[in-house]
């Protein structure tokens, strides 16, 4: 302990010259002001000030070296002390090493400041690039210093905790404990071991990983009216990690995995967002039902009212959109559940040919208009591909319960439409896989275009191979697995419906995971899961649909509300004329192209359904939001084009129910019309 006391004396000793220097700071400042105003003998005072400063700095460095020697001596004495345990030796040595690091970092900070001042004086104040580079270097230095200081602070906290634990152990050794106290002491030690075992050193493990950047963030606590309550809640949130972080790019973050996993936590922002969406969706959907509009309109309006362009009350936007994706998964599963493989055999050629021809025609028209408007071919291809896709979840809602029995030699429009939408989902996965290569091709020199084309062809071949593997897997599952699996679920779920729901959900997630691993869209996996289950017969289909539909309905509400979060009424109002013209142009073009393609590939007896199918394909898919955001981050499209894509997509989705109802009224016989509207 004497060695420890002497060492802490030497810890405090180097700080004294800095305190003296702080007292003299006022005098130095006055001298600088006089020099600036031309008072006094400038040359003599300047030389004297430099000599004094150098003398003080040299003295501090000598004292620092002396302290380092004392610390080395203290470390050697601790290591030779036979009265200390190995753990206590490591602790004391580590404490001395922390202070050594502090002295070295303080010295480095002085010379870094001098170097920074020298660089600033040598630079040109009119050269913005040079000033930017200097600022970047200072920012990097500050980030590294902050990380080092944070690491040192955590080490000091650990040292303090060790001292407290050592004091507790000493007190327990000097007093007799009751049986209950001994049990609690054993529990405390077991809890400490548990925390050490489950704690992940994510910060230390990732701070040196390549590509990791250090950034300054703001930590925002929830406001409370009462200051005392605010302090108490801040202490609790600081412990529970429920505050919000905001970086310099205005991105907001919340806790995903706490350091201490033994304490249960809940994201109250996300809970409030879901509760708010659920409460506001009811009157919005009710109002749309009362005036004869589809309820999805009300859910989108709910998202608009709560989103950034409305009340801005949704804080966990990413989490809400993620939950909404499950609405897409379950919707497509139920679509596949009503999609008979026998019907698919009848229309598989139409389902494959139609979307491919439509996409090629859209890209051709896009390149033509892009050439006339002097738009880059990469942008033209991307925008055309985005606009060629149609919304599978939306059309699935239109088709719920509208499938009808085929007449002899006739084709059901719902089967054709669903088959084409599934093919478009495959195209979506293909395009998302090819898009990075397409971006590189647009940025590469003309000499490497052939290489990029070959790379795209290789990617297309990989996707086609993945599709073949998926369908082969589906054949195996249908023949050998799905029947025994469902029978086992049915036996175990008698009187316990949750086992059936959980088993079907697990099968959906398994299929979407398989398709995602094979670089095919997860949506296709959900659809195929439904189609495989439907192969067990109508009784099975009805039982599973009855169980899954309530889950689908709630998650679909969240999905359509999340679409409303990306609707910006003010932007639409500013550019209403342009947006309405673009939306009508896109909808009319898609409608006419679909009708043209279907008139060429449909049999004569089924030509009348081309208008209904064309109406179902005339809107733009909500997945253009995802494609647009990726393209904007990659620099393929500008911010203005991205907002135009969002607005045109949203307006086309709002126009889709009107066009669908008009097509059904015009082309479907009256007895079959009610279930389709």
Curated annotation (Swiss-Prot):
The chain crosses the membrane at residues 286-306, 317-337, 350-370, 416-436, 456-476, 498-518, 554-574, 578-598, 608-628, 640-660. Expressed in the cornea, lens capsule and choroid-retinal pigment epithelium (at protein level). Belongs to the monovalent cation:proton antiporter 2 (CPA2) transporter (TC 2.A.37) family. InterPro entries: Cation/H_exchanger_TM, KEA4/5/6-like, Na+/solute_symporter_sf. Residues 1-22 form the signal peptide. This is Transmembrane and coiled-coil domain-containing protein 3. Probable Na(+)/H(+) antiporter.
């Amino acid at each position: 302990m004497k060695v420890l006391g002497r060492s802490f004396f030497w810890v405090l000793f180097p700080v004294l010259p800095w305190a003296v220097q702080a007292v003299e700071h006022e005098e130095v400042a006055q001298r600088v002001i006089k020099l600036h105003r031309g008072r006094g003998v400038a040359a003599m005072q300047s030389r004297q000030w430099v000599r004094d400063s150098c003398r003080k700095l040299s003295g501090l460095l000598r004292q620092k070296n002396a302290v380092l020697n004392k610390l080395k001596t203290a470390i050697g004495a601790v290591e030779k002390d036979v009265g200390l345990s190995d753990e206590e030796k490591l602790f004391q040595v580590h404490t001395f090493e922390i202070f050594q690091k502090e002295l070295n970092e303080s010295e480095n900070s002085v010379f870094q400041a001098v170097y920074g001042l020298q660089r600033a004086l040598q630079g040109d104040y009119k050269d913005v690039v040079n000033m930017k580079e200097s600022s970047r270097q200072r920012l990097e230095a500050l980030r590294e210093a902050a990380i080092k200081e944070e690491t040192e602070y955590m080490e000091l906290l650990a040292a303090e905790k060790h001292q407290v634990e050592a004091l507790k152990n000493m007190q327990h050794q000097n007093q007799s404990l009751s049986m209950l106290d001994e049990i609690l002491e054993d529990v405390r030690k077991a809890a400490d071991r548990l925390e050490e075992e489950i704690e992940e050193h994510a910060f230390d493990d990732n701070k040196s990983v390549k590509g990791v950047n250090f950034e300054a963030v703001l930590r925002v606590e929830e406001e409370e009216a009462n200051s005392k309550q605010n302090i108490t809640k801040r202490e609790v949130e600081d412990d529970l990690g429920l505050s919000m972080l905001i970086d310099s790019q205005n991105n907001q973050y919340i806790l995903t995995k706490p350091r201490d996993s033994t304490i249960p936590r809940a994201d109250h922002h996300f809970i409030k967002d879901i509760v708010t969406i659920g409460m506001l969706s009811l009157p919005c959907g009710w109002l749309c039902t009362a005036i004869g509009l589809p309820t999805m309109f009300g859910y989108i309006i709910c998202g608009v009212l709560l989103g950034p362009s409305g009340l801005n009350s949704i804080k966990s936007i990413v989490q809400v959109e993620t939950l909404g994706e499950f609405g897409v998964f379950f919707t497509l599963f139920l679509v596949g559940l009503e999609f008979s493989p026998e019907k698919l055999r009848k229309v598989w050629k139409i389902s494959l040919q139609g979307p491919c021809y439509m996409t090629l025609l859209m890209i051709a028209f896009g390149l033509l208009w892009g050439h006339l408007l002097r738009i880059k071919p990469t942008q033209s291809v991307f925008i055309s591909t985005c606009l060629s896709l149609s919304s599978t979840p939306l059309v699935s809602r239109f088709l719920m319960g509208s499938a009808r029995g085929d007449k002899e030699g006739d084709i059901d429009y719902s089967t054709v439409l669903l088959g084409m939408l599934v093919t478009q989902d495959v195209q979506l996965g293909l395009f998302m896989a090819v898009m990075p290569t397409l971006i590189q091709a647009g940025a590469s020199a003309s000499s490497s275009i052939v290489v990029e084309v070959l790379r795209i062809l290789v990617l297309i071949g990989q996707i086609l191979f993945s599709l073949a593997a998926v369908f082969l897997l589906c054949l195996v599952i249908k023949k050998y697995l799905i029947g025994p699996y469902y029978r086992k679920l049915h036996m175990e779920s008698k009187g316990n419906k949750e086992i059936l729901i959980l088993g079907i959900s697990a099968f959906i997630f398994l299929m979407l995971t398989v398709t995602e691993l094979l670089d095919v869209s997860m949506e296709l996996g959900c659809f195929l899961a439904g189609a495989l289950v439907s192969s067990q017969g109508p009784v099975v289909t009805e039982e599973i649909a009855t169980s899954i539909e309530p889950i689908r309905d709630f998650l679909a509400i969240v999905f359509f509300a999340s679409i409303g979060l990306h609707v910006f009424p003010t932007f639409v109002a500013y550019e209403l004329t342009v947006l309405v013209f673009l939306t009508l142009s896109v909808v009319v073009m898609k409608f006419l192209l679909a009708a043209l393609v279907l008139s060429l590939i449909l049999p004569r007896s089924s030509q009348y359904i081309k208008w209904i199918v064309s109406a179902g394909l005339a809107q733009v898919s909500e997945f253009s939001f995802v494609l647009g955001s990726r393209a904007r981050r990659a620099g393929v499209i500008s911010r203005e084009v991205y907002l135009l894509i969002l607005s045109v997509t949203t307006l086309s989705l709002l126009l889709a129910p009107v066009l669908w109802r008009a097509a059904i009224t015009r082309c479907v016989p009256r007895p079959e019309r009610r279930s389709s509207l």
